């Protein structure tokens, strides 16, 4: 997320619906459907950015993007929802900094809980390395 999130962990509970300005864009609106996003900080990069782990209680279209934008912390690279393009350019990002490291769901046929994991793709690993170089951890 762009900027420094104040809390180490929090929940965003805000309804999401279609934005009137676009067929593709969504926003927090009282007329929207319920949406709940839980998050934990995994790494901080000064006030420039914050790496978070997200757990969705609901699955609305663009939920992560809309919820973080609504609290003033859009995803890096997500200009549709207010990200400053300078950080993306600095990191060489050509997309939103969004990746599912782990998904858990009940298999539709077997009904068994299934977990799928994935590493960060190369472009996000490079961006993460650049952020760590720009913001070394303090001992």
Give the residues covered by each predicted segment.
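RNA pseudouridine synthases
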Residues: 1-139
